[in-house]
């Protein structure tokens, strides 16, 4: 079983946490380990979330860790993903169980497909 680490504990990260618990593979292929966020107090006002494990800059991936970014800023997302990949981390996609896919759809690693999303055939 893999351990999902969500990079970013802001609003997008909390949304992704909820979606991941209803995603294909949850509880069978992965469980949620926690968050990486530079702000250790990012979740202090919220209950029911996994812990912040540290900042992306300081985290060393464990062998069973897999990652997904939940950062709205594209430059920050790319920077944090590169930091984790440089240390051997791998990214997975989170696909909500209610998503619908046509023929020949390709979803790349690190993608987040939300609930009720629909993809037409031949989408890449």
Model feature map: region roles:
Residues 40-101:
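Phosphate-bearing ligand-interacting subdomains
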Residues 93-124:
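Structural signal for interior beta-strand "rungs" in well-ordered beta-sheet cores
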Residues 20-24, 84:
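Active-site catalytic pocket residues across diverse enzymes, especially alpha/beta-hydrolases
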């Amino acid at each position: 079983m893999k351990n999902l680490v969500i990079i970013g504990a802001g609003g997008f990260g909390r949304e992704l946490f909820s979606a991941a618990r209803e995603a294909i593979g949850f509880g069978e292929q992965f469980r949620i380990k926690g968050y990486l966020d530079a702000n250790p107090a990012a979740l202090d006002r919220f209950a029911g979330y996994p812990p912040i494990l540290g900042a992306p800059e300081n985290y060393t991936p464990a062998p069973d860790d897999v990652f997904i970014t939940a950062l709205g800023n594209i430059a920050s997302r790319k920077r944090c993903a590169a930091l984790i990949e440089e240390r051997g981390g791998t990214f997975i996609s989170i696909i909500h169980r209610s998503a619908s896919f046509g023929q020949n759809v390709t979803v790349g690693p690190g993608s987040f497909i939300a609930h009720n999303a629909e993809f037409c055939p031949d989408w890449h």
